[in-house]
């Protein structure tokens, strides 16, 4: 346990950020899971909406500093690729 006042504050900040980051990551995973479920049903319209929602979630994670922009680009590229397979 830290003894210095600034170190104590940093621990508190880290805990708060960890909680926030976990929440944002969870939102991204949930959006991607919903998209994958829509793909499994092969419903193009629902999948398109879910894809948009997943992309928004990924972009928000980048804005908040939770995901690196290249990791986000890779995720979005893979999601789009899978959509294009069923859209054919």
UniProtKB/Swiss-Prot annotation:
Keywords: Ribonucleoprotein, Ribosomal protein, RNA-binding, rRNA-binding
A single cellular component GO annotation: small ribosomal subunit
UniProt GO MF annotations: small ribosomal subunit rRNA binding; structural constituent of ribosome
InterPro entries with a match to the protein in the record: Ribosomal_bS20, Ribosomal_bS20_sf
GO terms under biological process: translation
SUPFAM superfamilies attached to this UniProt entry: Ribosomal protein S20
Coiled coil ranges: none
Keyword Zinc (UniProt): no
NCBIfam families, alphabetized: S20
Entry similarity comment: Belongs to the bacterial ribosomal protein bS20 family.
The protein's role, per its UniProt record: Binds directly to 16S ribosomal RNA.
Name used for this protein in its record: Small ribosomal subunit protein bS20
Organism classification: Bacteria, Bacillati, Bacillota, Clostridia, Eubacteriales
């Amino acid at each position: 346990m830290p003894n210095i006042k600034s170190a104590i504050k940093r621990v508190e900040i880290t805990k708060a950020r960890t909680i926030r980051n976990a929440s944002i990551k969870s939102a991204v995973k949930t959006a991607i899971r919903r998209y994958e479920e829509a793909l499994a049903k092969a419903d193009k319209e629902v999948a398109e909406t879910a894809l948009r929602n997943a992309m928004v979630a990924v972009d928000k994670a980048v804005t908040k500093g939770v995901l690196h922009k290249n990791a986000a680009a890779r995720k979005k590229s893979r999601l789009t690729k899978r959509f294009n397979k069923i859209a054919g």
